[in-house]
Amino acid sequence: MGIIESMRLDGKAIYVTGAASGIGKAAAAAFAEAGADVAIADINIEGAEEVAKEIADATGSKTISVQCDVTKQEQVEAMVAKIAETYGKLDACFNNAGIAVNAPAEEMTLEQWQKVIDINLTGIFLCSTAAGRVMLKQGYGSIINTASMSGHIVNVPQPQCGYNASKAGVSLLTKSLAVEWAKKGVRVNCISPGYIGTDLIMTREDLKPLIEQWNAMGPLGRLGRPEELQSILVYLAGDTSSFTTGSDIIVDGAFTCF
């Protein structure tokens, strides 16, 4: 089998959280294009249904849509159970749902802090362990989490201590699970994107001054595109990455290099 053929995901069942838009939507489309059947999970069920239909029509993937609040353990467990029952297995997952709150630390409320931690870190824990239990029983599986370059550096000029802390936690949680499950057939990795120009970011007028500053600071002088994460995610979800576990892959246009 050639290298291109080995990157195919034919017959695999994969779910993506936060898949109704942005990085999650791009990931789901990539998995489906590579041959996988994909479950589109999001708290926004209308958006998830729309993306599931769009991807199914474009690729022939057997898609389903699932509503899930990743901070609710019972919803996460139900999501994973439904996906495993629908496809008869769970080969890989991309735990991607997340939010950012920009606020000076001295002004951030406990509620704001807790919301960021609950979604970005506890949500990843709940999804990873729920998927992990299925995969451990199978004896195989690949878990991919979304961390961030913000887990490696302190972003400026926007103050976002809660986001930074949550993403640093995702990175070490990923490594911890990778070590625990390494000999049980389950791989766990994360990606750490830099500034990615999703539609939600690029269409917000209030973010234009920040985007200009980010572009000026970055070595490439631009934001990344969701599509520029697709090949890495397909690699991590598939069998060619069989020796890759515990990795935190930074994709930031060299932003963290200085």
Model-derived features: positions:
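Short C-terminal tail/terminal secondary-structure segment
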Residues: 2-6, 234, 245-258
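Short, small/polar-rich loop/turn modules that mediate ligand/substrate recognition or access, typified
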Residues: 89, 94, 182, 187, ...
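Substrate-binding pocket helix/loop in short-chain dehydrogenase/reductase
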Residues: 104-105, 112-117, 214
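Active-site helix of classical SDR
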Residues: 128, 166, 174
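Alpha-helical segment proximal to the catalytic Tyr-Lys
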Residues: 133, 179-183, 242
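Residue(s) in the substrate-gating loop at a strand-loop-helix junction
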Residues: 148
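A conserved structural motif in NAD(P)-dependent oxidoreductases
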Residues: 218-229, 240
